[in-house]
Amino acid sequence: SSAFQSENAGLVDFVGDEASILSEIRKLVSILPANNEDEAFDDCEDDLNRGCDGLMANDPDYIISSISDMNAFVEVKKNYAPSMVTGFIKLNGATVGVVANKSTDAGNVLTADGCDKAAEFVKFCDAFSIPVLTITNVKGYLATVENEKRIAKAAARLTYAFADASVPKVNLITG
């Protein structure tokens, strides 16, 4: 089912009725560049010196929407590995991929599924020349038997994805 593929396999970006899925796809297509060689810029009239009062909050959704143009954020694979947030924003008109760990969901730790989700997303951004912003607030790795089986390889894949990416990368440490 689409719910299983979304929550357990990470193969589906959006789940819902036809109207909501089409709405999300339109948002995604509008924020992505037409191809990997096009510049991903739009005009922006947001105040570049705007304040972000809740920036110290442990809620990456709030931080991401606060810093993005027009507070717009298109999250992808929301239901898969929910402790890791991936999606797209515009910063001063430029499309930027965002990776953030949702510290409130997993106690400030990384999971193997979250690392895999982030690695796949970084590779996608690199393929389309989209810069990556990482918002980090993490203490370590989730200590469960199931996670311990996969975390070393997953963390290595994530590290390699960042190291191999040729796009600009910025890390914002919030905790």
Predicted regions and their residues:
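Ligand-binding clefts of soluble mixed alpha/beta catalytic domains
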Residues: S1-G175
